[in-house]
């Protein structure tokens, strides 16, 4: 009799004593393990892809991703300007070309070039990850590159901030740059040959 009262007490209190007979548990379907958490980039890429696909579905008539062209992408980028936070001065504005304007103006807020460039990069990758062929990727088209270049240049002029492309560092080749005994590099030039 004492064993019956101790058995229930052990279960309720989380006793580590082994039970005499395990109770059969009803078989419940196990949920699949949670996928690993996405990186910030992957999460943003997924959000951007879903937003773009929703934009295409909202068109009249709706556009399937397989029928998407550069004109749809350009329309999408211009649509996004309404949510921009970067002041871009127009040509008639007194602050056009000034890095730090002294006052307020009514020039529009737009998406910054860097944001658009990063967005296109993510959508380009997402297109291929969702079954698109690289050679038919509308985000990689020349028209998109031209548009981004024009936005970059016009925003740089309007904001007085010149765009400077980062120079790629040359990889150092240890075979080409070995030092000579006199402290000069191993490469020869016409001035070294003349002396």
Curated annotation (Swiss-Prot):
GO terms for molecular function: DNA binding. Residues 21-36 have a biased composition (Pro residues). GO terms for biological process: mRNA transcription; post-embryonic plant morphogenesis. Transmembrane segments: none annotated. A motif (Nuclear localization signal) lies at residues 165-169. Residues 162-175 have a biased composition (Basic residues). Keywords: Developmental protein, DNA-binding, Nucleus, Transcription, Transcription regulation. Residues 40-167 form the ALOG domain. InterPro entries: ALOG, ALOG_dom. Residues 184-195 have a biased composition (Low complexity). Residues 1-41, 154-195 are annotated as: Disordered. It is found in: Nucleus. One of its GO terms (cellular component) is nucleus. Probable transcription regulator that acts as a developmental regulator by promoting cell growth in response to light. Belongs to the plant homeotic and developmental regulators ALOG protein family. This is Protein LIGHT-DEPENDENT SHORT HYPOCOTYLS 7. It comes from Arabidopsis thaliana.
